[in-house]
Amino acid sequence: VLAEKGMAVHYSDKFQGKKTANGDIFDQNGLTAAHTKFPYGSQVKVTNLANNQSVVVTINDRMRRRNKNIIDVTSRAATELGFIKKGRARVNLELVR
């Protein structure tokens, strides 16, 4: 999968300072995300389809495979994408590298 569309959400503050699946310390101010399949370290361009705002995040965590959302981003990424208040947005994901 090099690109996909679906719903993005942002992490709850309860994860701040906890370890991600790859061992990093989670930081809401970073530009990182969780995905079901993209390899750790992948750079993924996330575009909010409602406003066309984009941000590139690094995958450093995993989501459950049966999750209805396709990506879980930090609060910083959600702010830059313009959906921090709504809590979720329909997005396009594009694997950059």
Language-model-derived ranges and their functions:
Residues V1-R97:
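Secreted/periplasmic proteins
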